[in-house]
UniProtKB/Swiss-Prot annotation:
Quaternary structure note: The complex is composed of two ATP-binding proteins (PstB), two transmembrane proteins (PstC and PstA) and a solute-binding protein (PstS).
Reaction catalysed by this enzyme: phosphate(out) + ATP + H2O = ADP + 2 phosphate(in) + H(+)
Transmembrane stretches, start-end: none
Residue intervals of the ABC transporter domain: 5-246
Binding site for ATP: 37-44
CDD domains linked: ABC_PstB_phosphate_transporter (cd03260)
Protein name: Phosphate import ATP-binding protein PstB
GO molecular function: ATP binding; ATP hydrolysis activity; ATPase-coupled phosphate ion transmembrane transporter activity
Origin organism lineage: Bacteria, Thermotogati, Thermotogota, Thermotogae, Thermotogales
Major localisation: membrane
Keywords: ATP-binding, Cell inner membrane, Cell membrane, Membrane, Nucleotide-binding, Phosphate transport, Translocase, Transport
Length: 251
């Protein structure tokens, strides 16, 4: 199987505090990889590091390498804006912009130079369809994105990420603020999207990871304890810490 992201001996620091310790793992194309572990284990820091979202935090620094399709993403020559177009991010709390549904989705393409109304119309429709939201909002595209329900807002954020045609979508606890029905819809959507996109999701919800992930990475106190196919991790964990986390003995 082809890796699209390769993480090699990667560590991340906030000042003197180490948040991610010497992580090495490969993320495979068109698979769903779930990163699990207790609060403060470094999973969100690792996810944000893949998107270079921590760059401007005071005292943040990294060691080691993260490669996207063979390119070092921390290379000073890297065009970070262009890179983030290829590796999109969806956050824990739905973050629709205070503008219309249409403008939320068209925002990224416009930044990247798309001016044609005809092309923008097509991108908006296609992205909302991919995010399983089109049928619910197609007659009210001028409505503010902030007036949608929580689950709809999160799907709008996914549509916004899809609009710039990424190859990878990173999601940080995307369903933690949603009710069970909205959560189920997002999970189904991610499974569908993985046919064409690589998905990396951070989740506290072990059941969610088991339901949707092809691979699970378990982190504890900044370290990657175990990583492998979901069934293998769940049924035959090699590390005692993994087993204790999965059975609720540590958390």
């Amino acid at each position: 199987m082809e890796p699209i992201i390769e993480i090699e001996n990667f560590s991340a620091y906030y000042g003197e505090k180490i948040a991610v310790k010497n992580v090495t793992m490969k993320i495979f194309k068109n698979q769903i990889t779930a990163i699990i572990g207790p609060s403060g284990c470094g999973k969100t820091t690792l996810l944000r590091s893949i998107n270079r979202m921590n760059d401007h935090l005071p005292g943040f620094r990294v060691e080691g390498k993260i490669y996207f399709k063979g390119q070092d993403i921390y290379d000073p020559q890297l065009d970070v804006t262009e890179y983030r177009k290829r590796v999109g991010m969806v956050f824990q709390k739905p973050t629709p912009f205070p503008m219309s549904i249409y403008d939320n989705v068209a925002f990224g393409p416009r930044i990247h130079g798309v001016k044609s109304k005809h092309i923008l119309d097509r991108i908006v429709e296609e992205s909302l369809k991919k995010a399983a939201l089109w049928d619910e909002v197609k007659s009210e595209l001028n409505k503010s994105g902030t007036r949608l329900s929580g689950g709809q807002q999160q799907r709008l954020c996914i549509a916004r990420a899809l609009a710039v045609e990424p190859e990878v979508i990173l999601l940080d606890e995307p369903t933690s603020a949603l009710d069970p029905i909205a959560t189920q819809r997002i999970e189904k959507l991610l499974e569908e999207l993985s046919e064409n996109y690589t998905i990396v999701i951070v989740t506290h919800n072990i059941g969610q990871a088991i339901r949707i992930a092809d691979y699970i990475a378990f982190m504890y106190r900044g370290e990657l304890i175990e990583y492998g196919p979901t069934r293998e991790i769940v049924e035959r964990p090699k590390n005692r810490l993994t087993e204790e986390y999965l059975t609720g003995k540590i958390g």
